[in-house]
């Protein structure tokens, strides 16, 4: 009986990647950097002007996220990097989201934050960013030009591009979202 239990436990643990072998810090960092590059590529595909916005900004953050909603509750997680364009300093970050309201579904989405000032980037990296249930935004092009076309202005000097599949989301409807440093990868 003990042998059968041991065989079943080994079989189950080997079928779960996180249990079977923990990735090294370097491997985990590489996976997060790849996910961030995928997020940038997805945004550039649907909003080509975002490339200039990212490259000319003080810094940016790129996240690849996964969310799920079942009946009245939902949530999501994600990982990404924040990069200071001047120093090329990279900070590994995480995202967690909690939602309430009716719904059902699973989605994968990419977020690219653009920070016009080093102060805005520093605040994001060192204090995180929380978005409450009332957070909404609209694309503002007026004085800022076409570089931010398709982005949501969250605060002065902070823009957000959100891509789900191959389409650009022009409205942010995040609820209870927190961004914070990844203590294991930094």
What are these model-derived regions, one by one?
Residues 11-15:
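Bacterial N-terminal signal peptides
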Residues 3-7:
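N-terminal export leaders
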Residues 18-22:
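Sec/Tat signal peptide C-region and signal peptidase I cleavage site
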Residues 23-186:
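Small-residue-enriched, tightly packed secondary-structure blocks
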């Amino acid at each position: 009986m003990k042998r059968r239990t041991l065989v079943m436990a080994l079989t189950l643990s080997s079928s779960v990647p996180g249990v079977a072998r923990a990735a090294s810090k370097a491997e985990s960092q590489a996976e997060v950097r790849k996910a961030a590059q995928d997020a940038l590529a997805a945004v550039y595909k649907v909003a080509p002007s975002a490339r200039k916005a990212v490259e000319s900004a003080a810094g940016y953050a790129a996240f690849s996220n996964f969310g799920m909603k079942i009946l009245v509750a939902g949530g999501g997680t994600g990982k990404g990097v924040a990069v200071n364009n001047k120093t090329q300093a990279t900070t590994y970050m995480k995202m967690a989201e909690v939602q309430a309201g009716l719904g059902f579904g699973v989605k994968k989405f990419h977020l690219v934050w653009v920070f016009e000032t080093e102060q805005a980037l520093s605040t994001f990296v060192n204090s995180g960013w929380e978005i409450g249930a009332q957070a909404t935004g609209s694309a503002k092009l007026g004085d800022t030009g076409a570089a931010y076309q398709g982005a949501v202005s969250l605060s002065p000097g902070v823009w957000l591009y959100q891509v789900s599949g191959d389409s650009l989301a022009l409205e942010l409807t995040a609820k209870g979202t927190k961004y914070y440093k990844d203590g294991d990868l930094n």
